A protein has these predicted regions:
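Conserved helicase C-terminal RecA-like lobe
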Residues: 1-182
């Protein structure tokens, strides 16, 4: 959810969250949306966020997608006015994911809920340590921390990462590859 708020063209993130929690959006519907985006050469979000395109789908799927689009648009409206921790908490509440985990009552759901609370705590810590705390900076810091935790000490290797993730790291050789959608 957080990645999609920062970059609505991130179709991979969109596909991961479109039906989480369950909204009655099936694989066939997702494939039709993806096909339409590919055919029109536009990001998947533009198709998902187009009420006319969505209304042409089956009733339950259309309702789920319209609800999802409404949630994302509301969350994006808070992007500039809310702190990273507030945004994380807002995403958990508005998406319905936190409520789904609470009502599931399983050990796995409880573990996920604790992990999400750690995410909120990490956002709070980031805010305390950063003067101009924003969601994009928090996600970058979290990605760098995660990469550093998993860092392999082998010296003869290639590390693939985004340019944004590489900020502040030192490498003897850096190769930049440009890719554009469409």
């Amino acid at each position: 959810y957080l990645r999609l708020l920062i970059n609505p063209s991130d179709s991979v993130s969109l596909l991961r969250i479109l039906n989480v929690p369950k909204r009655g959006i099936g694989k066939t519907t997702v494939q039709r949306l993806s096909d339409a985006a590919s055919q029109l050469k536009i990001p998947l979000w533009e198709v998902v966020n187009d009420p006319e395109a969505v209304r042409s789908l089956a009733g339950r799927s259309a309702k789920g997608i319209l609800n999802f689009s409404e949630i994302i648009n509301e969350l994006q409206s808070h992007l500039l006015s809310s702190s990273p921790a507030e945004l994380v908490q807002l995403v958990l509440e508005r998406s319905g994911y936190l409520n789904e985990l609470i009502t599931a009552g399983t050990d796995e759901a409880e573990e996920r809920r604790r992990n999400l609370q750690e995410l909120v705590n990490a956002a709070l810590q980031y805010q305390e340590e950063s003067e101009d705390a924003n969601l994009e900076g928090f996600l970058s810091t979290a990605a760098l921390s995660s990469d550093a935790d998993n860092k392999d000490t082998a010296s003869n290797r290639v590390t693939l990462m985004t340019l944004h993730s590489s900020k502040g790291l030192e490498f003897s050789v850096v190769c930049l590859v440009g890719m554009e959608q469409g």
